[in-house]
Amino acid sequence: MKMGMAKHSPRNKEYLCLTICGYRKEGMSEEAYRNHMVNVSAPMTKDLMVKYGIRRWTQIHNQNATRALMAELFDPQMCRLADFDCFSQVVFDNIEDYKRMKQDPWYKKHLMHDHEMFADTKRSMMTIGWIKEFVVDGKAV
């Protein structure tokens, strides 16, 4: 099997997940950042993702109010707080699907420029890996 291809069978379904650990643009408030991502970028992006076979796309907004909740979860092993403003996760079968989406003329014209409106693209980071589920809808799998 080629690297970047998901492994499929009825009992073993694995997808790739691109995780973008994002920082907001300098000087932008948390609320303005979240608003732009949810109400401007997402509506422009989601149909294009569907067109290219993206299975799932989520945003996790890591604002001061939710970061404060971490004090209730820290323990001696887990005590370092990630300072990213958002985690955006894109799930797909094949890395080629995502690459084709990024080559779409509409993506190049509208979305590449949009990232500069809200994101600190110099500090934000990415990683990719296989998803392996152990609990789904409250049930062990």
Swiss-Prot record:
GO MF annotation list: lyase activity; oxidoreductase activity
Segments forming domain EthD: 26-121
Q: List keywords of the entry alphabetically.
A: Lyase
Q: Which organism is it from?
A: Claviceps purpurea (strain 20.1)
Which E.C. number(s) belong to this protein? 4.1.1.-
Q: What induces it, per record? A: Expression correlates with the formation of the sclerotia and thus the pigment production and is directly regulated by the cluster-specific activator CPUR_05433.
Q: Which family does it belong to?
A: Belongs to the tpcK family.
Name assigned to this protein: Decarboxylase CPUR_05434
Q: Pfam families of this UniProt entry?
A: EthD (PF07110)
